[in-house]
């Protein structure tokens, strides 16, 4: 279900403050966050944000095509290890 248009997109306050501070001084450093639910807004373009996937922080470079998506969409939490092996030798 989409968010109402009369509401602004959700961005965690601590993340927004860090991005605004970096935009003011023009710095380029990695921002570490656990806020996977935050929406990517145009002020984030050009920054590298390390998003937590449950185990580690994955650095993601924000581009203009990512605006409107959530941060968690770019840090997968599950790793596919393959389907179960068909072990015919043990059945004999």
From Swiss-Prot:
Name of the protein in question: Small ribosomal subunit protein uS19c
Organism listed in the record: Piper cenocladum (Ant piper)
UniProt main location, coarse: plastid
Localization (cell): Plastid, Chloroplast
Similarity comment: Belongs to the universal ribosomal protein uS19 family.
Lineage: Eukaryota, Viridiplantae, Streptophyta, Embryophyta, Tracheophyta
PANTHER family, per database record: RIBOSOMAL PROTEIN S19P FAMILY MEMBER, SMALL RIBOSOMAL SUBUNIT PROTEIN US19M
Function: Protein S19 forms a complex with S13 that binds strongly to the 16S ribosomal RNA.
Residue ranges of the TM segments: none
